[in-house]
């Protein structure tokens, strides 16, 4: 059974806007594979977050570590298993 993982992305000093398009392509690929639930940027421009589905934390980490934000060092990514207790 897949679990939800919240991925928080915080921009680093190495951030370059040219990574945004490859990051969006990465997210579109996750969406097409049924692994992405939602994503978006923070309105203050410091980063963003997305929710992925994975079997366990190790699988979520492997998935997220292929994000161009991570591979280029543009953002620090933090992964939390997320247990939703209230939802609309």
PLM regions and their residue ranges:
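Conserved, structured core segments of small domains
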Residues: 1-88
């Amino acid at each position: 059974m897949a679990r939800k993982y919240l991925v928080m992305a915080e921009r680093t000093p190495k951030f370059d806007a040219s990574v945004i398009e490859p990051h969006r392509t990465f997210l579109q690929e996750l969406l097409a594979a049924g692994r992405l639930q939602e994503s978006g940027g923070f309105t203050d421009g410091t980063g963003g977050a997305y929710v992925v589905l994975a079997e366990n934390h190790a699988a979520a980490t492997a998935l997220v570590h292929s994000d161009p934000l991570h591979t280029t060092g543009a953002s620090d990514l933090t992964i939390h298993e997320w247990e939703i207790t209230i939802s609309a």
